[in-house]
Amino acid sequence: MSSAERFIIQECFPDNVVAYTSTRCGGVSNKSLVDSSAQVGRAIQGRATQGKATQGKAIQGKSAQDKTAQDITAQENSGTRDYLGLNVGAHVGDDIISVRENRARLPHSDKITWLEQVHGNTVVTLPTPFIEADASFSSRSAHFCAVMTADCVPVLISDNRGREVAAIHAGWKGLEATIIANALTHFSTDPSQLIAWIGPAICGQCYEVNETLANKFSYYKNCVTPNKQAGKYLLDLPHIANQQLTHLGIKHVELSHYCTYCRSDLFYSHRKATHSNYEATGRIVSVIGLR
């Protein structure tokens, strides 16, 4: 990890749980990353949370393996392909050697199991040879759960004693297909004793959808609002995930205040890349595991 990086420590999980979300800083994709420490210093000044939230701590120079969930900051890309920085997606057209090097830079990289995500509702228990899934569960310290995102909602879950963990990739398809509920069936702990963290994702002010998609989630409170353009709606995926978690019995849910679309200088955003006429974009990763 370079000295230009900053971390926000998320202290909602037990001390023996490692959990973090990467951003775009410190990678090798596009071979042209420059020092963005001045921008980073302005960007990271704490975080907002919901429910029984704890205040984040902005620190410099602390190992990413020291505590719990962390956001690693970055800079904005220029060019035709939005890979610049710590892209960990091997399926988006980036140079595979760069992606492998970026993955190797992640904390506890040797323990991470990478999924082939398909926007479904399959959850696998690690270790497993079957990796076509959108969520993973682990109760072993040698096997860390991870999901890649670039607007979709990453959800990290642990029991309050730090014995079981899960990582969930929840786009609208996964949320509709009850992937969160599927993941909870793997825990031996009662949902009331679980802790969930909803990571950076596209916010409800930036995710415009058509009426057909909006109607799929119309029964969620304050998560679908008409947009100015006729026939278009704004859909709030993070808060849909939050309502699902709460409905399933989880009492301690925290939300990142970062929007991947608004802060494409810090995160990869598929929708922002599309609107900016990029051919492709990278992926961040959310990781959770047991020490």
Predicted regions and their residues:
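Active-site microenvironment for binding and transforming phosphate-containing groups
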Residues: M1-Q50, I59-R291
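Noncatalytic, beta-rich nucleic-acid-contacting surfaces in large DNA/RNA-processing enzymes
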Residues: A53
